[in-house]
Amino acid sequence: MRRVIVIVVFSLPLCGSWKALSQTVHSPVSAAYLGLGAYSNNHVDVFSFHPNQAALAKINAASAGIYGEKRFLLKELSLYNVTVALPTHSGNFGLDARYYGFADYNETQLGLAYGRSVGNKIDVGVQFNYYSVRIAGYGNASTVNFEIGTIFHLTDKLNAGLHAYNPVGGKLGKVEEEKLASLYSAGIGYEASEKVFLSAEIEKQEDEPINVNAGLQYKFLRQLLARAGVSTATSSMYLGIGFGWKSLRMDATASYHPQLGVTPGLLLIFAFNKKEQ
């Protein structure tokens, strides 16, 4: 029981999620890894719309992905994420489901996203979420929120975008003092070559310091890629290797926090037939 209390009370503030007056849904420790392709034209996948729903507009094949991580090697801090993208002639749709925690403390978010191009230079996207948190002995609390984003195609190699999560705020459940925090970000991506992609994102979460995510992807072969990056707010680093075979891709990831240690993760993506261009 003492282990449970220590995990809930001490690990959540260090992860940047539980605060006295505001709370945000847990993202993977390697969230920057999953969303690295958001501001790319050539390296978009089913997870790319996580940091900006406008990235859905560039997904040209129905896809499904699952990601799991054992945060800081503690099973009580495990996170699971299932994502689906469905392109249509009227725009592209996405589904996102996340579960974090264990029996005595857990968070769940279910999201429905939509993204499309507006002309040749701008993509837009929006997502509606149902978020809930449960603490054993204290009950449940839930709320509904939304996030919105846009991506500008400045050149053939350079993209930039803006994103807002829960911009209007709102309380969590019936507790007036507890609310879901807002988060704003601006990102940029540069296609240095067919093999090299660079990305950077600035985030500002309510009541938290500014965070910068910077990442690099290098594609050795069509079937083999590597990603690496850093998040400045926690001085965390991440690294991953992805292997592709036909319509399947598997990535093994790891992130490192200077105080809390290593978080291993595993990602699987399956892409169905591409839609007609």
Spans of model-derived segments:
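Bacterial N-terminal signal peptides
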Residues: I7-G16
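Subset of outer-membrane beta-barrel
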Residues: L21-Q277
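Positively charged n-region of N-terminal signal peptides that target proteins for export
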Residues: M1-V4
